[in-house]
From Swiss-Prot:
Superkingdom: Eukaryota
Membrane topology (UniProt): Multi-pass membrane protein
Residue ranges of the region described as Disordered: 394-425
Residues recorded as bearing Phosphoserine in the entry: 406, 439, 445, 471, 474
Lineage of source species: Eukaryota, Metazoa, Chordata, Craniata, Vertebrata
Cytoplasmic face residues: 1-24, 90-114, 187-225, 294-674
Protein name as catalogued: Nucleoporin NDC1
GO cellular component, one term: nuclear membrane
Assigned keywords, A-Z: Membrane, mRNA transport, Nuclear pore complex, Nucleus, Phosphoprotein, Protein transport, Translocation, Transmembrane, Transmembrane helix, Transport
Composition bias, Polar residues: 407-421
Assembly, per entry: Interacts with the NUP35/NUP53.
The keyword Transmembrane belongs to this UniProt entry's keyword annotation: yes
Intervals, Perinuclear space compartment: 46-68, 136-165, 247-272
Amino acid sequence: MATAVSGPCAGRSRDILWRVLGWRIVASIIWSVLLLPICTTVFIIFSRIDLFHPIQWLSDSFSDLYSSYVIFYLLLLSVVIIIISIFNVEFYAVVPSIPCSRLALIGKIIHPQQLMHSFIHAAMGMVMAWCAAVITQGQYSFLVVPCTGANSFGSPAAQTCLNEYHLFFLLAGALMGYSYSLLYFVNNMNYLPFPIIQQYKFLRFRRSLLLLVKHSCVESLFLVRNFCILYYFLGYIPKAWISTAMNLHIDEQVHRPLDTVSGLLNLSLLYHVWLCGAFLLTTWYVSWILFKIYATEAHVFPVQPPFAEGSDECLPKVLNSNPPPIIKYLALQDLMLFSQYSPSRRQEVFSLSQPGGHPHNWTAISRECLNLLNGMTQKLVLYQEAAATNGRVSSSYPVEPKKLNSPEETTFQTPKSSQMPRPSVPPLVKTSLFSSKLSTPEVVSPFGTPFGSSVMNRMAGIFDVNTCFGSPQSPQLIRRGPRLWTSASDQQMTEFSNPSPSTSISAEGKTMRQPSVIYSWIQNKREQIKNFLSKRVLIMYFFSKHPEASIQAVFSDAQMHIWALEGLSHLVAASFTEDRFGVVQTTLPAILNTLLTLQEAVDKYFKLPHASSKPPRISGSLVDTSYKTLRFAFRASLKTAIYRITTTFGEHLNAVQASAEHQKRLQQFLEFKE
């Protein structure tokens, strides 16, 4: 899925990714494995619960903990935890994936990489359920058991029967593993939210631990309920298949079949399956939480490297290169932190190069921040145009904000994309620490699609399934280039229906070129098909876009823009007293112009019909949903950044060159009327 990157660039990206994240990943995996014996001990204690003989209960539990078979299964569980941790590393994302329609959500779930993720987790869930069943002992330990009523099968010899209790355990573990994988992508659990307040790793883990255990127990309860319903209707299929394949009998004299109501009302079985699910989810969530804590910990990027060989990791070069997304997020987070709390590092930003006397550090940092903010402005303008005209944003071409060039841009001049793409499928496009990604040629667009059929492409092109901007297009509005998921012929037809002035107007007569009769007939048929399908409730149920999801998708990567705002505004405010060379004053008009233009775009955006003016109340949950309110945090950060600059410089800003509209808006900030 990753775009083709040259070998040296990919190698440098992998090197910096390993230097920054390598030890964090190893530490999170080690702690996940070290915490596994504690979880296993709790599981053994509760699996042998005996309230009437507490001393005997505890002594037997701890004696079993040191037995050879428990140690063996503990090693096997450690391998499972390592595999789960590797998948956490491979599938993380710093930009959440927000499908804007139900069909896009289905496409996200059935993507080949997601299917592989689900299959592996189902297998690992079955392995953990097998280990839990054996550790529990009793009637759940083995899949094959001797038949008690051997004579009933017509032979006095000993017969082997299928232990349906053990099969129930294995299938429940597989379903729990698959459900974990499904919710992992549906709830954006692969999204890495960066903490607003920096805390010690132990404090963050301790704060999440109680919520983690509670969430695991409740989720296991619901999964057991769902599995019982599923086993009641379909349980006979795996039971008959395994018994036939292994030539096993089904002894109904020992216990009732579990695919009946009376068989499923076995409270002991339900309790142990629920406990197994809670154990599985707790250990997997612990590894997931530890990876999130370690990966989002702040990292210090030096502004000026002490040695020449360390220049690849200095902050200006990281920001202006094309690093992996998480490295760029960590760099912007570091910019936000030191701009507030480190005067010595701020002095390095304001310093001049020797020899030459050029402000390379400030130029590189401010240029990247302004490029990010200009990119957000253009994105909001495109969204407003699409919403105002009921049209469609051109998703086929990435938005390239205008680059800021200056004479000082010689040191850190590297080709790059100034705006990170916002994928619609989970952002798996990152440099892997372990292996290269399995790529599929179908997913090339920034918004991506898991479908390759031309028929589905044309169908999706009619309803614009995966595009998060705009709404279904009216017949009179055909604009802004080809739709998503269109074939080459469709693109040519769209280009023909959108003639540019240079091609549609002749140089002599300035007359419009009329479309052919065949093309008009095709267009009419397409509109008739579109109107026919739009009246079908089931089709519109899958193709209609959710307004809230479309709005969230616009601000899905707003976290790095928030850090760019805060870092840039704090540096500008600090320059009033700390900038001895006046390097900030040369770019202050451009900074104010960018911030005020962005403020105007944000104000217009929040006046749109579907844009709520108040953030929704988000209840405390293990799964982070802060990305749903990023637009409100971005609006507050933008206004705070402008006020931070105006309160620091005061009336001195009246001497800054700006347009009349910006001067008026700046005066409102100076008078605290915004």
